Amino acid sequence: SYMGTEKPYEAFLSMILRHLAPGGRVVIAIENKYGLKYFAGCREDHLGTWFSGIENYADGGGVRTFSRKGLERIFASCGVKKYHFYYPYPDYKFMTTLYSDAYLPGKGELSNNLRNFDRDRMLLFDEKHAFDGIVEDNLFSVFANSYTVIIGDGFDIKYVKYSNDRAKEYQIRTEICRDADGIATVKKIPLCEEANEHIRGMAVAYRNLLERYEGGRIGINRCTLHEENGRVWDSFEFLEGRLLSELMDECLEKQDQEGFRRLFAEYVERTGYNPDYPVSDFDLIFGNIMVQGDDWTIIDYEWTFGKDVDAKELAFRAVYCYLLEDERRNALDLDWILETLGITEQDAKQYREQEMDFQKFVTGQRLSMAQLRDRIGGDLLKPTDWVQRFR
């Protein structure tokens, strides 16, 4: 109705394109009508009704969102040939991560799916598990919750993750860039001036960890500090391979406890090398280790401190974080872990309390998006619970 034409979306885009300067870009941020969250029980954003987009707006109305194919049909109708799709996650309203066709999410990455700040939602299934299957079948571009589309020239940046729910001195973003020759680089960039020293500290951590693990069986991803025209950032190699957490997940999915134990024992042996050296990477979680055949590399060592931390504490923390990320990992025999590491129940309690203190250290007075949703967001309605109650 706003455009007063039979094809208002095409007319609106054509009008915008006429205002572009040479080399200009149009940026479109929009919901995906087939976003997974709408299947899982989120309401349509504009109408506040369930399944309206999925049902192709059968009840009418002037509001529309589109699938990727739907957007591409509009572009073709307007003569647009150069465009690039990005995928804000969880969605474009409260994005923490931005993916692209050149860098799609891996299995296990899409776990922060509750963002219903404005209204109640149903919870019909676990979106993380559904996303895992979608990622495996290469369907993420179909079921991503939102799209950001760049009409015009693209960017070297193929992936961005914002770590901004922290104290200001630790707020950074992580980018993966790919140049015209296809060479990928990882960058860590401060989001504010207060975080400059944190970026500089990663280059120091790289050198210190190299010294600690010299002669051992684990590598450190190379870090280079850059300072130009008042800007500070770190660059890292982009390593191919598989995360240790992925390999461990495969073992649990196959009920291969022995395979998991072998990987864990190797983790303890490799990361525990030279334990008396006064440098420790406190965040030696399984997802921060890349495995390429027999080569293991620590790819993220942001939280490295100039002191020795007991290897069993670091290993326990890695397991603790691993279990918190996915309830399906509860198949892991935690008693075996405690026995292997020589950790008592009292030790475990102390380590959990230390983890809470560490999280407070990182976040300062800030709350994560998940914590904010828990405090001020809408309710979660679980029809599956009602079905069981009234059967």
Named regions from a protein language model:
Residues 46-59, 276-330:
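Catalytic activation segment of kinase domains across protein kinase-like and atypical kinase folds
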Residues 158-210:
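ATP-binding glycine-rich loop module of kinase domains
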Residues 6-25:
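A short glycine-rich, Lys/Arg-flanked "PGG" loop and its adjoining helix->strand segment in the class I
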Residues 70, 84-175:
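Rossmann-like AdoMet/SAM-dependent catalytic core
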Residues 297-390:
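C-lobe/activation-segment region of protein kinase-like
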Residues 219-268:
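Conserved structural core of kinase catalytic domains
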Residues 61-87:
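Short alpha-helix
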Residues 25-50:
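Conserved class I S-adenosyl-L-methionine
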